[in-house]
């Protein structure tokens, strides 16, 4: 009887041990590639790695950069396999390396990407037709070159400052609210049409942050994000949407940012991920 009990105890212990071994996973590395321009540079190249590192999340971030690049130009580059990009890659050590004259095909083959994101250039970001003229073919090109597990992402960028002098602000009658709503509408319509499940709502996060004391320091020229405050809001949005972790309370912040500014930025991002189509006043 005693031997039988010992045998049962041993078998149970062995079973539990084996379950633990089977369920144990090596440290996951999340790999994100953005096909973008200076707005993807603003969003993912600065603070996203540090936000992730603070929570022991391992991440590799790639950005295919051409300033002001539209979806149409990305598609033409793909068709011609042009080495037209600056490929900025942040590795596991947090160091950014830039390789010039890189092609989309080469970037897609460089890693087993978990996420690949697309965005329209800022002036056309709220014009739905310009998304659909190029994105379906561009997305098909990408899907043919990445693993089946790779998730497609749309990056919902932000409206210009109310006083912006950007030449394309006329597309929205120099009206920030109109531009914001147009971007939200265009991105969500494109996502629905193409079956994209993930939208990173940086535009809504920035709009939320504009209800806080950060409002006057979110851009550096009326459209590109401020290198500290605006970029931090965008990175917080990417962090919460991609990693599915509440960014509020993450301890990483740029040195020049106050705790109150950090709180406003994080809450702006969190609210945007929760309600990506609705602006919330952050107190």
Residue spans for each PLM region:
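Bacterial N-terminal signal peptides that target proteins for export
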Residues: 2-11
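Conserved SGNH/GDSL esterase-like catalytic core that processes O-acyl groups on lipids
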Residues: 30, 42-132
């Amino acid at each position: 009887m005693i031997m039988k009990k010992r045998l049962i105890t041993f078998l149970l212990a062995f079973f539990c041990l084996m379950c633990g071994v089977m369920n144990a996973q090596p440290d996951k590395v999340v790999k994100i590639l953005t096909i973008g321009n200076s707005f993807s540079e603003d969003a993912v190249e600065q603070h996203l790695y540090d936000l992730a590192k603070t929570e022991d999340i391992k991440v590799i971030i790639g950005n295919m950069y051409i300033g002001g690049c539209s979806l149409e130009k990305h598609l033409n580059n793909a068709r011609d396999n042009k080495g037209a990009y600056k490929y900025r890659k942040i590795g596991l050590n947090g160091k950014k390396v830039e390789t010039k004259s890189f092609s989309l095909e080469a970037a897609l083959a460089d890693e087993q990407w978990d996420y690949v994101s697309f965005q329209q250039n800022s002036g056309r970001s709220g014009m739905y037709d310009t998304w659909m003229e190029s994105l379906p073919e561009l997305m098909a090109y990408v899907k043919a070159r990445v693993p089946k597990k790779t998730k497609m992402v749309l990056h919902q960028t932000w409206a210009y400052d109310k006083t912006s002098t950007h030449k394309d602000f006329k597309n929205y009658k120099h009206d920030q609210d109109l531009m914001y709503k147009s971007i939200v509408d265009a991105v969500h319509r494109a996502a629905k049409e193409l079956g994209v499940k993930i939208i990173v709502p940086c535009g809504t996060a920035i709009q939320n942050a504009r209800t806080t004391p950060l409002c006057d320091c979110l851009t550096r020229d009326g459209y590109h994000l401020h290198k500290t405050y605006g970029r931090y809001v965008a990175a917080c949005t990417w962090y919460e949407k991609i990693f599915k972790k509440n960014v509020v309370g993450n301890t990483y912040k740029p040195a020049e940012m106050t705790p109150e500014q950090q709180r406003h930025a994080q809450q702006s991002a969190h609210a945007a991920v929760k309600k990506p189509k609705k602006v919330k006043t952050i107190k």
